[in-house]
UniProtKB/Swiss-Prot annotation:
Additional note from the record: Is regarded as an important allergen. On the 2D-gel the determined pI of this protein is: 4.05, its MW is: 11.35 kDa.
GO MF terms held by the record: calcium ion binding
Organism: Macruronus magellanicus
Gene Ontology cellular-component annotations: cytoplasm
Name assigned to this protein: Parvalbumin beta 2
EF-hand domain span: 38-73, 77-108
Keywords, comma-separated and alphabetical: Acetylation, Allergen, Calcium, Metal-binding, Muscle protein, Repeat
Functional description taken from the UniProt entry: In muscle, parvalbumin is thought to be involved in relaxation after contraction. It binds two calcium ions.
Amino acid sequence: AFAGILADADCAAALKACEAADSFNYKAFFAKVGLASKSAEEIKKAFFVIDQDKSGFIEEDELKLFLQNFVAGARALTDAETKAFLKAGDSDGDGAIGVDEFAALVKA
């Protein structure tokens, strides 16, 4: 899904680091997967991969399945992880993460 943007080995390593339930940390994940060091254009491409329904926003149900965008068969985020991730990214309080909010979250 992230061919040409992220290395498979980086995706696998980032997933291994948050295998246990409630161990997901978006800052550590974005750093490990290599997204934090990417250009604004590449981060935008990543956003559109994660925005499964192409609504222009990443909603809670898409966040829950966030890890599966990086490696097929990865675990779903727990409710607590999903809510914390949404809260961190949703700076305008509309219940979803827009592309600019996502970029800010990746670079946080």
